From Swiss-Prot:
It comes from the Eukaryota. Light-harvesting photosynthetic tetrapyrrole chromophore-protein from the phycobiliprotein complex. GO terms for cellular component: chloroplast thylakoid membrane; phycobilisome. Its main location: plastid. It comes from Agarophyton chilense. The light-harvesting antenna system in red algae and cyanobacteria is formed of phycobilisomes. These are composed of the phycobiliproteins phycoerythrin (CPE), phycocyanin (CPC) and allophycocyanin (APC). Cyanobacteria also contain phycoerythrocyanin (PCC). The phycobiliproteins all share the same subunit composition and organization with variations in the covalently bound open-chain tetrapyrrole chromophores. This is R-phycoerythrin beta chain. The keyword Electron transport applies. Keywords: Antenna complex, Bile pigment, Chloroplast, Chromophore, Electron transport, Membrane, Methylation, Photosynthesis, Phycobilisome, Plastid, Thylakoid, Transport. GO terms for biological process: photosynthesis. Phycourobilin binds at residues 50, 54, 61, 147-148. Heterododecamer of 6 alpha and 6 beta chains. The basic functional unit of phycobiliproteins is a ring-shaped hexamer formed from two back-to-back trimers contacting via the alpha chain subunits. The trimers are composed of alpha/beta subunit heterodimers arranged around a three-fold axis of symmetry. The phycoerythrins also contain a gamma subunit which is located in the center of the hexamer. (2R,3E)-phycoerythrobilin 1 binds at residues 72, 77-78, 82, 84-85. It is a peripheral membrane protein. The gene is rpeB.
Length: 177
């Protein structure tokens, strides 16, 4: 995983060139938006339990068979595993947002996730639905449209951060589909 600075330096070094022009402008933008990024990560962290439990509850409401005998969320152990997986996925989304780089998702979260879920008999469509609910919830928190919030409102336009988070969620959904 490379942060924005390491990525720029690595690219410039590979070209045997100085860092300048558009690379410096991109870093300036990254720095100026840094407080928004930190606030967004803080909102995810502060509301993670609610975001994940709402996503899993929503997934189950749409597919009640998941909590019937034989369903993938039936028994406390399986429900706990489902909630744990949701927390892990959301945690890696927050890491990617903090770094401004999605490679942490590929390297540490998505690599082999689909195969593991298939081997365990986890319905991938339910996973995709839970991720889409998390995407909507996180987007609402970041863009200040969530009805219940913990903390202050992020100042300024955060649509770029909301779009970035949406792209991470879409990447996760595509990886497990």
């Amino acid at each position: 995983m490379l942060d924005a600075f390491s990525r720029v330096i690595s690219n410039a070094d590979a070209k045997a060139a100085y860092v300048g022009g558009s690379d410096l402008q991109a870093l300036r933008t990254f720095i100026s938006d840094g407080n928004k990024r930190l606030d967004a990560v803080n909102y995810i962290v502060s509301n993670s339990s609610c975001i994940v439990s709402d996503a899993i509850s929503g997934m189950i409401c749409e597919n009640p068979g998941l909590i019937t005998p034989g369903g993938n969320c039936y028994t406390n152990r399986r429900m706990a595993a489902c909630l744990r997986d949701g927390e892990i996925i959301l945690r890696y989304i927050s890491y990617a947002l903090l770094a401004g780089d999605s490679s942490v998702l590929e390297d540490r979260c998505l690599n082999g996730l689909k195969e593991t879920y298939i081997a365990l008999g986890v319905p991938t469509n339910s996973t995709v639905r839970a991720v889409s609910i998390m995407k909507a919830a996180v987007g609402a928190f970041i863009s200040n449209t969530a009805s219940q919030r913990k903390g202050e409102v992020i100042e300024g336009d955060c649509s770029a951060l909301a779009a970035e988070i949406a792209s991470y969620c879409d990447r996760i959904s595509a990886a497990v589909s």
